[in-house]
């Protein structure tokens, strides 16, 4: 196979042997599309592309589980935006599903034939089913931290009704680090990774709060981190495969449910720890830092009908080649 990687920011990509990087909607992008046999995306299909006979369109989707409402099920979705669903999704040959709840709810939300759903689990999550010391080393080398340094990943999600430029009171992240360092006798850092739709900046003077967006691969950060703090980001599904603690900001969950899209699965049934707000994080993080939630998460995966087994890439390749 000839592999083409499409991005809006080719200058940020690490060059790898056998992979050509092109800018989205550039002349090279359209030329290469004309001769590609398989087009893979993690969202909608670019409306500027005209599908040729014999081409395969596949989406891996960008969120695991089936937490946030999508498609026609959304509460405040723009009607013009919603009118484009058919144009974006009806051309799909395959939709990769992480769990039975995803198949059931997304088929209805996007009016898709259930036959196109590949119930394989998510390719990006295969890494959580085996040991990858090289991933940890990559992250540690990038941020110049030692093997003993612990990582708290702070990864808030996108909310349409939130201010265009949102700030969190990062004093509580600093306090959390102080408390964790005192309790564990280890050094800690925070990687602050904002959603790419939202301009959130790290204006902390604390040198232990680092730019999580500077690193190119979110799954590497999830694999390497010891704790995850978020609001309603679907990365909770991915991180739960590690069995490590997930902390949710409950005030943001309530806002999203009442003012934005809402949830397919009520958030009070999720197995993750809930902080009233970011001010409650220091106490919660210290209390639950060493807990193993594997059993609790396993029950949740069973309820959702998880397809995650660590073999998604292998299964999808077999389907595409046959």
Can you say where each PLM-predicted feature lies in the sequence?
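Active-site and donor-binding regions of nucleotide-sugar-utilizing enzymes
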Residues: 1-131
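Donor nucleotide-activated moiety binding/catalytic core segment of transferases
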Residues: 22-37, 191, 196-237
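A donor-sugar binding/catalytic signature common to diverse glycosyltransferases
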Residues: 38-61, 66-68, 215-260
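C-terminal alpha-helical cap of glycosyltransferases
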Residues: 309-322
């Amino acid at each position: 196979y000839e592999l083409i990687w499409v991005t809006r920011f080719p200058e940020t990509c690490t060059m790898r042997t056998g992979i050509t990087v092109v800018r989205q909607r550039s002349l090279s992008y359209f030329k290469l599309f004309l001769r590609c046999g398989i087009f893979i995306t993690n969202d909608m299909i670019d409306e500027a592309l005209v599908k040729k006979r014999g081409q395969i369109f596949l989406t891996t989707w960008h969120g695991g589980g089936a937490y946030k409402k999508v498609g026609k099920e959304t509460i405040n979705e723009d009607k013009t935006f919603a009118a484009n669903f058919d144009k974006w999704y009806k051309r799909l040959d395959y939709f990769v599903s992480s769990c039975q709840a995803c198949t059931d709810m997304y088929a209805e939300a996007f009016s898709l034939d259930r036959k196109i759903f590949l119930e394989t689990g998510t390719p990006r999550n295969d890494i959580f089913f085996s040991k990858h010391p090289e991933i940890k080393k990559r992250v540690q080398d990038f941020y110049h931290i030692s093997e003993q340094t612990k990582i708290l990943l702070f990864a808030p999600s996108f909310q349409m009704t939130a201010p265009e430029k949102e700030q969190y009171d990062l004093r509580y992240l600093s306090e959390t680090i102080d408390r964790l360092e005192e309790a564990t006798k280890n050094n800690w850092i925070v990687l602050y990774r904002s959603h790419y739709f939202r301009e959130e900046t790290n204006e902390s003077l604390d040198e232990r709060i680092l730019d999580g967006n500077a690193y190119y691969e979110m799954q590497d950060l999830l694999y390497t981190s010891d704790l995850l703090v978020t609001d309603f980001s679907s990365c909770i599904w991915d991180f739960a495969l590690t069995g490590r603690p997930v902390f949710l900001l409950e005030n943001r969950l309530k806002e999203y449910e009442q003012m934005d899209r809402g949830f397919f699965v009520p958030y009070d049934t999720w197995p993750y720890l809930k902080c009233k707000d970011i001010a409650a994080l220091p106490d919660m993080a210290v209390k639950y830092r060493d807990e193993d939630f594997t059993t609790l998460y396993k029950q949740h995966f069973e309820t959702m009908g998880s397809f995650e087994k660590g073999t998604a890439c292998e299964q999808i390749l077999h389907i595409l080649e046959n």
